[in-house]
Amino acid sequence: MKFHIITLGCPKNQVDSEGMSSILAAQGHTPVAHADDADVVVVNTCSFIAAAREETLDVLREVAARKTPGQYLVAAGCMAESHSALVAAAPGVDALLSTREWMRIGDVVDTLQREPAVAASSAAREIIPLSSAPASSDDLRVPGAYADWRTAPIRRRITGPSAYLKISDGCNLRCAFCTIPSFKGDMRSKAVGAILGEAQELADAGVKEIVLVAQHLTDYGRDLGLKDGLALLLDELCAVLPKDRWVRLMYAYPHGISERLIATMARHPQICHYLDMPLQHAHPETLRRMHRPPDSDRTRRLIADLRAAMPDIALRSTFIIGFPGETSAEFRALTAFLEEVQFDRVGVFRYSREPGTPAAALPDQIPQRVIERRWHTIMRLQQGISRQRNRRWVGRVIRVLVEGQGQTDDGRLLSVGRSFRDAPEVDGQVLFWGTAATGTFVDVRVTQALDYDLWGEMVEAPADDARSENGT
């Protein structure tokens, strides 16, 4: 059968979609570029916040409206787990596949191929036709025992010079605003050997940047009995990867960042001097209500240690604006913290009241108009900070991973890429005149700094390893 996968949400979902694609391809099914050409359309759903769930339902409705006779629609992933009844009730959905069961996509497709208009049951019942039973969420689930994602054979489909590598799934934290543990469960780490094998396969396929992702990256290996598991993994990873590769760390919660991890990042040439460190707020009372570590002074010391070990490090963080009870004083403390710390990159989320979370039941919910005003204040503040941080690079040479080419309206050719300071999809770009092959590293002298991007010109002197990517 021909299949097409639509991925919504975060990079972890992208990894799961690649896993489903590789499983289906290994079973003889054929990927196609457009949903209209597929016999089976898989939508890997997102349930992060209300807006993500609405987008998921919109996509399911859109695909269902275009379904042709004999075409099937499978809803997979987080929302299929967290809101299974709602997803099952969406018109045209033929099967559900939860976020913990994506590696059983082959069973689902084989079932649909073998018995038209059927879906699966989650309990001990046999496969049953939808036409003869209620279309409840249970009736749509895939049967059988849970298959562990950590050992599922995956052959990644390489589509560019960068790839995400998920090292764990689930989270042991219970932040007051977050629903993820309710459908992902506690953290489960992938074995070091399995990660090394996947990384080696990616490198052999030509991937130049491996981005490590997880719900809680710095907690990696705790369930395996490892101390400083992420640092240990990075040592092993850099031992097998060529020197001209990048390794990037995303979703690194600060209370898991140890002295050993900082030293490991500084020591290995492959590791980008970049850290995505979600903090969510800076005022201790707000953090307590969030069920987050409230020690902002420790965070300041940690940032100082990171910059002492890697003076060129680019730091990114994310914050939630309008959390219940956030007073004007607490908000001012956050803006003061941003001015003091000077992050290179910041993502800002408007608080979303998620049913079933402790935060949803808190008093003093902030009016939306106040959240919006504070969000714009933070964004304007950080825009200026990011511009100033970018200006430090004017006149300097920085290594760039080329991601594509283009041209201006007047026909001038240019290339687009990212430096070590820029994670895929969420950060800025480096643009420079001329053309360079996609997937190659080039050195660029920065000539202009914008709010989030850099402009420059390619220089001839190549760097001989990945170390210069962290700045010369």
UniProtKB/Swiss-Prot annotation:
Domain TRAM as annotated: residue spans: 391-460
InterPro entries: Elp3/MiaA/NifB-like_rSAM (IPR006638), Methylthiotransferase (IPR005839), Methylthiotransferase_CS (IPR020612), Methylthiotransferase_N (IPR013848), Methylthiotransferase_N_sf (IPR038135), MoaA_NifB_PqqE_Fe-S-bd_CS (IPR000385), NA-bd_OB-fold (IPR012340), Ribosomal_uS12_MeSTrfase_RimO (IPR005840)
Domain Radical SAM core: 157-388
Enzyme class (EC, first level): transferase
Signal sequence annotation: none
GO biological process: tRNA modification
Protein name listed in UniProt: Ribosomal protein uS12 methylthiotransferase RimO
